[in-house]
């Protein structure tokens, strides 16, 4: 297992870069109301596929979300298992905040998402920070052969989560992804995930890690290749044990 690597998290940098990029077009209220303004923009658009290719609201939404540090535990699980210098793919990258942290920590990061305002901003951020990294368009060719691929808070946006996992598994030796439990009042941008079935799919692989974070986010890391019956049994046991432990802790509170 690689030595512990500290990621440099600077939330103020997220806002500062967006301000610089947008200049006079920057709207502080949209950053402060990052969720509401995105919901409003989606309602006005009315077409999910078009929305993901045209949204400017995601510039604010993803910036504000990055500033919370919510995904830092996800990244720390990755760097515990994959050393700097490894080739990793940020799949569904948005504005690229996660991959930028990894790139500055010495990883060979590549990005993939639809061509949209978020990836145009990402290209600016890479140049602004003096970094070079490919930004692949999901509508075109996305390469494989990566040491690891991750997709954080992405799978709940797709129509077929199992096809999505297959896309990740084809591209890297290690897959890291999180599954969000549906909650009442969920945003219209999220599809309810069959979490139990997705965890069952993962358990048929060699499980490297499983954690339940933030009360509803099932984070899994697993090998994409074939595995033995014994390893599948171990993987299922680890998932069951973690869920039982978390449920017991929640009931004790």
List each language-model region with its residue ranges.
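A conserved beta-strand element that flanks and buttresses the S-adenosyl-L-methionine
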Residues: 150
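Conserved protein kinase catalytic core
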Residues: 119, 159, 184
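Conserved beta-strand signature within the Rossmann-like core of class I S-adenosyl-L-methionine
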Residues: 172-184
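Histidine-centered active-site/metal-ligand motif
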Residues: 157, 186-191
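Hydrophobic adenine-recognition pocket in adenosine-nucleotide-binding enzymes
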Residues: 154
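Conserved N-terminal segment of class I S-adenosyl-L-methionine
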Residues: 1-143, 165, 189-253
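A short, conserved alpha-helix within the catalytic core of class I
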Residues: 158-171
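Conserved acidic residues
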Residues: 86, 147, 173
């Amino acid at each position: 297992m690689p030595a512990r690597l500290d990621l440099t998290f600077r939330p103020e940098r997220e806002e500062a870069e967006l301000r610089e990029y947008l200049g006079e077009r920057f709207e502080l209220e949209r950053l402060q109301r990052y969720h509401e303004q995105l919901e409003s923009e989606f309602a006005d658009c009315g077409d999910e596929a078009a929305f993901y290719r045209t949204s400017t609201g995601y510039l604010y939404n993803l910036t504000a979300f990055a500033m919370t540090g919510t995904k830092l535990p996800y990244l720390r699980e990755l760097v515990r298992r994959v050393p700097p210098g490894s080739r990793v793919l940020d799949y569904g990258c948005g504005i690229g905040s996660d991959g930028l942290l990894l790139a500055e920590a010495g990883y060979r990061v590549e990005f993939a998402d639809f061509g949209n305002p978020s990836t145009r901003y990402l290209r600016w951020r890479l140049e602004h920070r003096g970094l070079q990294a490919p930004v692949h368009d999901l509508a075109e060719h996305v390469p494989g052969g990566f040491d690891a691929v991750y997709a954080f808070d992405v799978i709940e946006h797709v129509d077929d989560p199992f096809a999505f996992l297959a896309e990740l598994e084809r591209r890297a030796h290690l897959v890291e992804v999180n599954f969000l439990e549906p909650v009442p009042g969920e945003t219209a941008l999220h599809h309810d995930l069959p979490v139990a079935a997705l965890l069952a799919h993962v358990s048929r692989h060699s499980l490297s890690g499983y954690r339940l974070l933030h009360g509803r986010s099932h984070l899994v890391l697993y090998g994409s290749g074939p595995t033995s019956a014994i390893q599948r049994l171990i993987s299922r046991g680890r998932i069951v044990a973690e869920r039982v432990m978390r449920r017991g802790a929640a009931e004790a509170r």
